[in-house]
Amino acid sequence: MTSLKRSQTERPVTADRASVVSTDGTPKVHTDDFYMRRFRSQNGSLGSSVMAAVGPPRSEGPHHITSTPGVPKMGVRARIADWPPRKENVKESSRSSQEIETSSCLESLSSKGSPVSQGSSVSLNSNDSAMLKSIQNTLKNKTGPAESMDSRFLMPEAYPSSPRKALRRIRQRSNSDITISELDVDSFDECISPTYKSGPSLHREYGSTSSIDKQGTSGESFFGLLKGYKDDRADRGPTPTKLSDFLITGGGKGSGFSLDVIDGPISQRENLRLFKEREKPLKRRSKSETGDSSIFRKLRNAKGEELGKSSDLEDNRSEDSVRPWTCPKCFAHYDVQSILFDLNEAIMNRHNVIKRRNTTTGASAAAVASLVSGPLSHSTSFSSPMGSTEDFNSKGSLGMDQGDDKSNELVMSCPYFRNEIGGEGERKISLSKSNSGSFSGCESTSFESALSSHCTNAGVAVLEVPKESLMLHLDRVRRYTVEHVDLGAYYYRKCFYQKEHWNYFGADENLGPVAVSIRREKPEDMKENGSPYNYRIIFRTSELMTLRGSVLEDAIPSTAKHSTARGLPLKEVLEHVIPELNVQCLRLAFNTPKVTEQLMKLDEQGLNYQQKVGIMYCKAGQSTEEEMYNTPKVTEQFMKLDEQGLNYQQKVGIMYCKAGQSTEEEMYNNESAGPAFEEFLQLLGERVRLKGFEKYRAQLDTKTDSTGTHSLYTTYKDYEIMFHVSTMLPYTPNNKQQLLRKRHIGNDIVTIVFQEPGAQPFSPKNIRSHFQHVFVIVRAHNPCTESVCYSVAVTRSRDVPSFGPPIPKGVTFPKSNVFRDFLLAKVINAENAAHKSEKFRAMATRTRQEYLKDLAEKNVTNTPIDPSGKFPFISLASKKKEKSKPYPGAELSSMGAIVWAVRAKDYNKAMEFDCLLGISNEFIVLIEQETKSVVFNCSCRDVIGWTSSDSSLKIFYERGECISVESFMSSEDIKEIVKRLQFVSKGCESVEMTLRRNGLGQLGFHVNYEGIVADVEPYGYAWQAGLKQGSRLVEICKVAVATLSHEQMIDLLRTSVTVKVVIIPPHDDCTPRRSCSETYRMPVMEYKMNEGVSYEYKFPFRSNNKWQRNAGKGAHSPQVPLQLQSPMISRVNAGKGDGKMPLPERAANIPRSISSDGRPLERRLSPGSDIYVTVSSMALARSQCRNSPSNLSSSSETGSGGGTYRQKSMPEGFGVSRRSPASIDRQNTQSDIGGSGKSTPSWQRSEDSLADQMEPTCHLPAVSKVLPAFRESPSGRLMRQDPVVHLSPNKQGHSDSHYSSHSSSNTLSSNASSAHSDEKWYDGDRTESDLNSYNYLQGTSADSGIDTASYGLSHGSTASLGASTSSPRSGPGKEKVAPLWHSSSEVLSLADRTLETEGHGMDRKTESSLSLDIHSKSQGGSSPLTRENSTFSINDATSHTSTMSSRHSASPVVFSSARSSPKEELHPTTSSQLAPSFSSSSSSSSGPRTFYPRQGATSKYLIGWKKPEGTINSVGFMDTRKRHQSDGNEIAHTRLRASTRDLRASPKPTSKSTIEEDLKKLIDLESPTPESQKNFKFHGLSSPQSPFPSTPTSRRALHRTLSDESIYSSQREHFFTSRASLLDQALPNDVFFSSTYPSLPKSLPLRRPSYTLGMKSLHGEFFASDSSLTDIQETRRQPIPDPGLMPLPDTASDLDWSNLVDAAKAYEVQRASFFAASDENHRPLSAASNSDQLEEQALVQMKSYSSSKDSSPTLASKVDQLEGMLKMLREDLKKEKEDKAHLQAEVEHLREDNLRLQEESQNASDKLKKFTEWVFNTIDMS
């Protein structure tokens, strides 16, 4: 309906009950009730609700009464006229206005038309009260129409704008000819008192009330009468323009009482509440003072039983009856709306069912309101024939809604509409980070709600979820929830249809027609829980709310025996559940298809109407309902229907607004679409040809093209949406109103308004339509360009509830499918929400009543629900049986929602409110009683614990967020709730502890960033108090951990004098209690304050390359092209292409510390890529590791998120002015291993350096126990991790000493802390990833940070590594635990073994994995290392071990750029995996950064890669301490250059430095220059901006880094037995060239010489380092004689460096080829043999080298010899390069083939699907 037609309120209603006015203004009353007419004419008041129905039209005024002869006062008229006496009234004027209003409301005889002031109200004595009530009842019976009226809407208060508002009730009969002069002077003052807001002057200005007012059946109100007869006489009383404001008088309870549901300031629920309160005193008075009004009751009942509420109800029901109805606790509700079912409200609203609410709604309300800016006379253009106009005087009429004052460039504030312009979010009442003080309410809420893992509050519908249907809801994170849909409407279809059940219909005297369905079932899943039988019940009344649910048989008191085949009497079941229902009125329904069909229509009416649902229950080819129900396969069809989901249909209008336009006519007159609009339409849906279109057509003509030739159609989830596009509908050149277009769009409930840049802000007041309730405004920015984006705003009619998804504040949506989904979800939810507005609910209610009447009258038998009632005399003979008591607590095992009335605390608004707490087998919901809306919901599987007392309960869920409720009904409620929680969740009661500090101020435990206790010091105070590993802190000193950042948490623990904590105990196996969302879903991030962006932006769901976190794409690699990102990823991911794996796996594979952003990899910090890699590999190796705090999460690994994590690759102090790590290392070396952990120099942190930024994510507690840390579930997600390994996102493994205590014996002091956590964890500018990266990392440290004292390197903590190393036990699937006593080397070897097994399986799969390029830009920033195809596959695992081991070991990390192909890495023992990465990274990221260079900050340490069987790959030169300028960068580059060169198919920037220079630098260690230190940047570790100048440190004998093996061996026997040993023996300065070569022919030969500088650990301490995985094999190895230190040439001596370099290169190549061959041929050989050969070769080379060094002359003489060798080697090298190129080409081909095969597979799958559908359709047809 559009405004082109006169609105309902503007037209006279010609029903038999309506009254119309002739053109001359004479009232013509069309009613057969002569007495009513006389009564009305004489009094002119229409005081009763009945009279409103037959009252005169709104245009009539009070004068007409004086102009017509008065009817003689006779009989009742005379008594009424003279009563009550004036004096009595004066005396009783003190009576509260509330009672008088109540009297007027119920008796309806108070004078409506006469000017009365509310202040001095008239009081009635008890006899008068009874008489009036009786008269009212009598008159109501006489006037048939009255039965349909609801007195609430007919009293003056129902008209906020009515003139009567300011008039006070006077002590006189209700004659309309009264004048102002007759008002009492004392009461007159009240009219002009400050509380009277209608206007300052007493002048008469009558006008009809707003068309939005609720009106009677006639569509006219009494106050409309006054307007038509208005004159200008000044003696008339003032006309109140807004009744509701007038009613706001001093202190009356009823102040502000308005029943104008649509536009009144008070909600319908509030009105009802006030109405009930006002009703109480009257009932008490009428009963006590009058005794019994049975005569009148009988009189009325004789006239008609179904009219109004019976006097029995009024007189006999207790006060409790006016309270909200509470369902018996034994009843388990099926859905949310069942909990909202209120029987008392249904009784009170019964009369309102068939009342037609003739109102101006939607956009028309705003349009009319905006047009009336002055007195009524100014709006003549809208007057109806009877002079009824909507007087919305915006200034004078304070009753008019003014809008919400929210405006922006898209939409303007408008009366009767509410705007959503961004930042509005769902209400949050829980105590969580989103509503804590540090967050800005709405912005964080909207973001949080988009991110939230569970349903939105408006999206919760069905609460009882069958076990087989319990879903993890994994897709909710990326899919929008459809809201405001009553999915419980399918309860009958799912649980009753075609199953044995009973239907009973009847007409209850209080409730009207009712329908009950009841079914007894024996659910399989309940046998174990107790009661084997369950009764499912549906109770329907004329109200839209329906009671649906079940009750266990054991919970019902009965005279019959429970659990028998016969069951309990249905009468007893219903009487117990619905005691207010008169079961005697029920009769059994016919068991016919028609009844079933009618019931389904009745139940699904809301869905059918709201969605225009086409429920597809017919087979193809069928057309009639009879065919459908008589078909044998109906059952199959319904099953299909349930399985496939229903197909909903919606129609949505789209209006096109060009630049400068704003009005409806302008938009409708845009003949064709512009390019920006076309672009938008193309994104939104598919352009379809209407002629012959067979899908949902939305009233468009698909036969003759009369409504246009094309339209826009799309589908979203289960919805079909047809758009009525203004430019696609027919254009009529001569019709400015474009009726053909408006005919469709004007009848759409939801309309999209598309604005071109420059369009005027939209306002609903420019639209005239009763149906358009919601407008979604979309404005294009930069249309038709690559940067096109859209901003969105919504304006909705004020009685339409809010709906999602929320619009983020200040965000524009790029053109993408994400935006399309957002917009379609918004539109669907808008229409669903609009159907909850009063207009549509009234229409639906009328329809529902008709259905029920039809069922109750025409489809019942004569069989009552209790057949025994036919022979009542039988019961006289025997004593009546007593009912057995129900089993106590039986209902607690129900599957549906058990409900308790509680008072909940709203932490966001700091207030309490009454609500209903419902707990089902799947959900916990809180429903506010006043607004009847869900304000909180979460899955029962997300509950982790609770704290209970006698009257209050705090429930903790997900990550420690909590809600708090109090019981005020019964002291037993809390106990029952706790029992119910125990039944439906895995949580437990919390424990409160008071923790003491030891002498050092330490609490004795580590806590990770999630608040989970990572480790507890044995026998410490915390241990004694009962704190266990895996316990979850939820409160610290009364502050909820969920509201704290990690830094704040640690500060509380450090600074509080008395530390009181509330913990959730772990499971029996010491794993922490986790919510389902944490276990199975992506972790929710800790947001920084930038959260304005929509979730979808942060998590690019649709771009595969952005999800590479799992693959660990070395987030550090400078943008590795997708293809390079190794297929490995996909292989690792079970063959699912990169980023395409299903969310669950993805989620699992996304370690928290990894950033989820999709930003270019190069931007992701690669703190030393190596570091990263390491970590990442570690993390990824178990890619599933979810960071569980418990195991803490090793998952934080660097993963791809790389950059955003602050894993510090070096201790913070490493950057500016820090002491050289070397020195630090030295300090701690010994202590690390077992020392006290106190020797930690505390480095100051430098905020900028990347090193800081990259805290390793793995923070292993420094304890030496290694628990099984990861269990990888089949799906690849770490199901449980044992706490030991903590990879704290922000802390470096142990190596950052500050983060964790280094010594394995660390006492876990409670002070340390993640101080660094505030540093920015992102590089340079924050990119998406930061936003979205799991900022977990942000400050978290795996250990509680609670060890302040410990800052040294924790390399020593074997545990740390160990833990992590063991973690990758996934290979064999076994968990190996390294006992506390394992030495780090043992741990490593253990890891080796596990990895070995893994490696075998995986090595072939991982292609060129992790090759890091550490190419640095010598000018200045270091570019992140890139891992080739970065994928972490198991390599990672292997790498873990290696990295771990190295971490473990305190050995300085050496950057070894060993190149090992994935194969190698996977080699049985982990191959030397990414050397660099592991090397430094190993420590850096996941492992303790144990590797700090001993040489100087400038040195890069690469850890050597271990050769598969433990061969040592590289021991390398680490001492870069003294280098000449630019060395640092160059060195780094050179070291890895080979690898980058080899691994990357694409050319990589090469550094200026040459190998020769590098060798010089490496060899000439004694001559460093300060500049070199300045220039040197720790590659992956430092951000371009943050160089790490290292403080010069005395060289202090280059403690060469014993390569892992050598370290090992040294630990065992201090002589070198390992292969590395002989290399290690070189002087601290010696250079070893060790590199492992991949033997994997299929993968690119990854060769990178790993140059590492061996460093001797200080104090002779040896740590297990990477390559020492060969622990197992050392016993088999023969010690190799110590070759002695190799002397290096004096730097000053003449030396032909070019020759030397050539020789070195030749040697390297030769070795490389040798390795490749041996790898290929002897892969199975033990590492020992490989290493032996290698060592021999190395020995020979070294010997020759050393001999050459002995004397310069000798060296010179051998130059020729070396040159010869060099030529040969060059040739070999050339061949190798050619081979490599060939292999690279093959890899590319394989990748292409893989993609092609995937596409073909997809196509085949699609075809198969189509074929299957065709087959089924064919079968159906047959």
From Swiss-Prot:
The gene that this protein is the product of is Sipa1l1
The protein's name:
Signal-induced proliferation-associated 1-like protein 1
Q: Which SMART domains match?
A: PDZ (SM00228)
Query: Does the keyword field hold Phosphoprotein?
Result: yes
Subcellular compartments: Cytoplasm, Cytoskeleton; Postsynaptic density; Synapse, Synaptosome
Q: Does the keyword Coiled coil apply?
A: yes
Listed Gene3D superfamilies: 2.30.42.10, 3.30.1120.160, Rap/Ran-GAP (3.40.50.11210)
| Compositional bias per record (Low complexity), positions renumbered to this chain | 95-125, 1188-1198, 1300-1315, 1358-1367, 1437-1451, 1471-1486
What are the Polar residues biased-composition ranges?
Answer: 1225-1244, 1417-1436
Q: Which GO terms describe its cellular component?
A: cytoplasm; cytoskeleton; cytosol; dendritic spine; glutamatergic synapse; neuronal cell body; postsynapse; postsynaptic density
